[in-house]
Amino acid sequence: MYALNDIVLYKGEPKRIVSLSNEYVETYIKLEDIYFNILQNGVEPIEISKPFLMKNGFVLKKLLVTFDEDKFAKFVYLNDGFAIELYISEKDDDLNVARLVIHKNNVGNMIDVKLNYVHELQQAFRMCNLQYLADNFKI
């Protein structure tokens, strides 16, 4: 399920969703400053990847972290007042976020979720009151 400001692919190009309806998704073409409607089934999710995380300020801290008998790559994002840890599963070549830990005011809030796509990560950040980070991802 998509939400406003989620970033998706349309014809291989990243687009930001600016309105939603049952039949159409209106997306904003950032470089051309024009709006157009597209069928929702023409929209594809963007997979979370290591290059995407690094482009958006996340740093690979440990290549392999083990918990629950699975192996993960640990990425960290640091900013004034908070830190984010993402643990990316490397099981069966399936790259997904298995654990999201957000530290605010020295308190860590852990969310165990399976996130495969950028829009899912954006929505998780919004639920944790990190709207500005979610809405400013670089693709």
Please describe what each predicted stretch is.
Residues L60-D93:
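Amphipathic, interaction-prone secondary-structure segments
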Residues D6-I7, E13-E26:
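Short beta-strand-centered aromatic/proline hotspots
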Residues V25-D33:
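SH3/SH3-like beta-barrel fold
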Residues F125, N129-I139:
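Charged phosphate-binding loop/patch that engages nucleotide di/tri-phosphates or the phosphate backbone
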Residues A83-N116:
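Intrinsically disordered, low-complexity regulatory segments enriched in Ser/Thr/Pro
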Residues I34-K62, D112-C128:
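Intrinsically disordered, low-complexity, charged/polar segments
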